[in-house]
Structures are given as C-alpha cells and as structure tokens.
C-alpha cells in the first residue's frame, strides 16, 4: 500500500505559512531600523526674503549624517548642520547663520534616546549671537520620522524655538509613485526673549556681550514702520515704541510612511520686530523695516529626488515581502485544501 501524502501536505502547508509570515516580518523588521550610514545633503531653492537691510536672496544647506553607536546597536548617532547663506546679486555668497547638533537616536522610533545628552551650537551674524548648548533629554523628532509612520500628530523639535511642538497629519498624496503622508506644524509668534531664556538654561558657552536688550528695538515708530503700516496699526511717526522680536513658522513635511524618510520640506519663516504677538501675527502688510528674516524656504528638486532614491529601495523591498507573504499564505491554503481532500478520499476508501 502506497504511503499517504497527507503528512507531507500538512508539513508543506505549515512551512509555507511560516515562510509567508516569518520571513517578511523578519526582513521588514530589519529594514525599517534607522540606518547607521546615512549621508544626506538637502538644499533649498534660492528664495527672496526680507531682512533688516531690505530684500536679499537666501538658501539653506542642511546635512544629516548617521553613524553607529559604539555602546548599543539599538542606537545611532545623528549629526546635523544647518547653514543659511546670503546670495547678494553680483557678490560672493556669505554664511549668515550656522547651527550644528549631535544627538543619539533610537533606531526603532527615531526619537532621541532618553538618558543621552545632546549638544548644539549656533551663531547668527545678523544678531551677533552665538551659543553652545548641552541639553539633558531632547524631545521630539528631528531628521527622521518613525518607520511605519502613522496618520497622527508627533512631537517635532524646532531648533530655533528650542522645544518640541506637535506636527499634525494633514493628508496623503503620491511622490514618484510612492504613497506619502503630509504633516504641518505651526509655531505662533514666539517671543525671542523666551527662546533666549530657554537657551540660557542649558548653555555651556554664550556670547558675554549679548543681552536680552539686544533682542529689543527702541525709537520712533516712523523709524520702523512704513506709512502704510503706521495707518494700519494706528501709529504716528513720532510715537515712541519698544519692539521685541518674535519667531513664527509654518512647516510642511512630506514623509515616506514605510521608512520615515523626509521627502520634502517647506518652511515659511517669520522673524520680525513688533510691539506684541498680535502685531507680529499680522502679515497683511509686508514688514519691510521690521524684518529680521521673513521668507519661504523649500527643498529644491534635486534634494527631493535624492530623498526619494534614499527611500525607494526599502519601499521596493516592502512590496516584494508583501508579495512573498501573499504567495506563502496562498500556498499554505492550497496545500491545506489538498490535505483536506486527501483525508476525505482516504476516509471514503476505509
């Protein structure tokens, strides 16, 4: 009597099911960890922005570099820099601001790892301001989102505000054939005095000549406001005013949800002198004489293409593993069906 194929069909079905479940899970789980060898350079389109001396052209260069953590494979070191360059027509470009940061990220969540100090340094030529900052536990996302990004809000760290502010999911679209999520963050008229106080709390090195009074302007309203603004705000030219600086930003981030890679970044930044937050929010008239920095910075197309290429191999791998999972589970069902038929036929012959 021939040996029944039933046991082999059952074993094959179990193996197919395991292959369809375990292999994709292991491969995808390994692939979504934040890589420890990322080198990414982002550049914004040259943009016309308002500054205290008038309109100028500016671009921002941003680098992200990850490297292995020597103590724990579950962590990765992130080093990032931001450089703002003025590009005066007919003159060499010059760096007007620089920021660098070094922190330890969790490779699974992309958040700063608790208990690991971060270091920042920045210099702003226009304000004659510079500082080095050692934070305890920095909170919020920075250069990456978590893999398997969800349609929800996340805390996102703003290096100027020096705090994590929610960034909200706003919708999805497609970029280069990839499904992407869009997030938006709004920081509203934050007084620079508050930023300075927050910075001073962790500062290890400050410019000793810089004081809170340097973030304030005093004088006649006519020295700071155009005639149109004077009428709009109900001020007279000889009215004495005290202006503080306020920081606002509308930030739109486009993310590949499979890998957490940021694919596009748009930042509408407003740093202005104003009597109060309400006046700082009023952008109905361009603040031609009150602008520290007012402009929209958006990644250029080359940067967007490079970000897509950074994410695409993992996206393809996930699609391939989805197919492996479907085939494995389908084969398991087919083999179990064959085993069932074999069992019924065998029982009918008994």
Q: What would you call each of these model-derived segments?
A:
Residues 2-10, 24-27, 316-350:
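Juxtamembrane interface at the cytosolic side of transmembrane helices
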Residues 115-132, 201-215:
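N-terminal short leaders/motifs
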Residues 33-41, 144-147, 226-229:
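Proline-rich low-complexity regions
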Residues 2-130:
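Solvent-exposed N-terminal domain segments of exported/luminal and surface proteins
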Residues 127-162:
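Short N-terminal edge-element motif at the start of the domain
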Residues 12-18, 35, 146, 171, ...:
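Glycine-centered flexibility motif
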Residues 236, 240-324:
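Membrane-proximal extracellular "stem/stalk" segments
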Residues 154-271:
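Membrane-proximal low-complexity regions enriched in glycine and acidic/polar residues
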